[in-house]
């Protein structure tokens, strides 16, 4: 069974999830418009698998850009999909565009290693 991925319905819910996370948060921003939808659905699968693999080291949050516009602006996200690694309420790394499992794993390993 895949580890649960949080899906906030509004900015305040995103902030709540962020405040309750015991460590780093992978916020991946998605969109529902036609050009973004296929890549975002593919990222759902990739993030789901890695959330299971990383377990308690990481909290995954699927962030709909339309439902969480303040969060989207706060982290400087301009397109979907975009992955943002957040620690202590600050973005420590971001990567725009779809990623394979290997690419996302490399992104996480690099930046989680920098966090200690």
Residue ranges and their predicted role:
Residues 16-17, 71-74, 107:
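CheY-like receiver
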Residues 79, 84-116:
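Non-catalytic, surface beta->alpha helical segment in thiol-disulfide oxidoreductase systems
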Residues 20-35:
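Short active-site neighborhood of thiol/selenol oxidoreductases, capturing the structured segment around
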Residues 1-17:
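N-terminal "domain-start" segment that seeds a small globular fold
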Residues 37-41:
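Conserved phosphotransfer microenvironments
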Residues 18-19, 52, 112:
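Residue-level signal for alpha-helix termini/capping positions
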Residues 23-26, 69, 75-84:
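Structural micro-motif
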Residues 6-10, 29-31, 43-44, 48-70:
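Thiol-based oxidoreductase modules, predominantly thioredoxin-like and allied folds used
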